[in-house]
């Protein structure tokens, strides 16, 4: 469960290392975001000499959460960290690689490009 002021790791090579959620896209007073939700975030830590810089406002899709994800078949998936992938206005990832495992549910939300870049889909 991601809410405003939550710090997330970045799971791609876009140049950002850490994000802080400032708004959840979708509803006017939505409190929490889960896997597959789009958030507005600010970059808190970035790699030097990359296109994305610190204190830049970006959109990101959540790919991993510490909070459990329960599937319809009863399987429960939990990750060790909260992570997101930086995207552009069309929903395409800004990076060319994705690190770590990605949930299968992202395919339902039309983030197929992120799923295809991921090394492991759970």
From Swiss-Prot:
Pfam families: Ribosomal_L14. It is found in: Plastid, Chloroplast. GO terms for biological process: translation. The keyword rRNA-binding applies. GO terms for cellular component: chloroplast; cytosolic large ribosomal subunit. GO terms for molecular function: large ribosomal subunit rRNA binding; structural constituent of ribosome. It comes from the Eukaryota. Keywords: Chloroplast, Plastid, Ribonucleoprotein, Ribosomal protein, RNA-binding, rRNA-binding. Binds to 23S rRNA. Part of the 50S ribosomal subunit. Belongs to the universal ribosomal protein uL14 family. This is Large ribosomal subunit protein uL14c. The lineage of its organism: Eukaryota, Viridiplantae, Streptophyta, Embryophyta, Tracheophyta.
């Amino acid at each position: 469960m991601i809410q405003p002021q939550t710090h997330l790791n970045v799971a791609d090579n876009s140049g950002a290392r850490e994000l802080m959620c400032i708004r959840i896209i979708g509803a006017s007073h939505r409190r929490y975001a889960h896997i597959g939700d789009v958030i507005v975030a600010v970059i808190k830590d970035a790699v030097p000499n990359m296109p994305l810089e610190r204190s830049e406002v970006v959109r990101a899709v959540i790919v991993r959460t510490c909070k459990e994800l329960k599937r319809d078949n009863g399987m429960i998936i939990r990750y060790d960290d909260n992570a997101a992938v930086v995207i552009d206005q069309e929903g395409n990832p800004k990076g060319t690689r994705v690190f770590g495992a990605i949930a299968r549910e992202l395919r339902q939300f039309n983030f197929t490009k992120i799923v295809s870049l991921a090394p492991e889909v759970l």
